[in-house]
Amino acid sequence: MSNKGQTLQDPFLNTLRKEHVPVSIYLVNGIKLQGQIESFDQYVVLLRNTVTQMVYKHAISTVVPARAVNFQVDVPAE
């Protein structure tokens, strides 16, 4: 993944994690997962509900927070 994609993805996921925002994660096959983001890295998201699931990012279509969130994007100077 390009670094530019990470500049949006990481602050968004980190805000959801730090603020314990409930999320719905839709997978590319249509399955809906719900829970809170416990952690994430370049390839996976750990989603906690009654159990913790490791969800590979390439399988994720959409992440929908249960409420609006504000997050800061640090745009590197070019």
UniProtKB/Swiss-Prot annotation:
One of its GO terms (biological process) is regulation of translation, ncRNA-mediated. GO terms for cellular component: cytosol. Pfam families: Hfq (PF17209). GO terms for molecular function: RNA binding. It comes from the Bacteria. Keywords: RNA-binding, Stress response. Residues 10-69 form the Sm domain. SUPFAM superfamilies: Sm-like ribonucleoproteins (SSF50182). PANTHER family: RNA-BINDING PROTEIN HFQ. Belongs to the Hfq family. RNA chaperone that binds small regulatory RNA (sRNAs) and mRNAs to facilitate mRNA translational regulation in response to envelope stress, environmental stress and changes in metabolite concentrations. Also binds with high specificity to tRNAs. Homohexamer. HAMAP family: Hfq (MF_00436). This is RNA-binding protein Hfq. It comes from Bordetella petrii (strain ATCC BAA-461 / DSM 12804 / CCUG 43448).
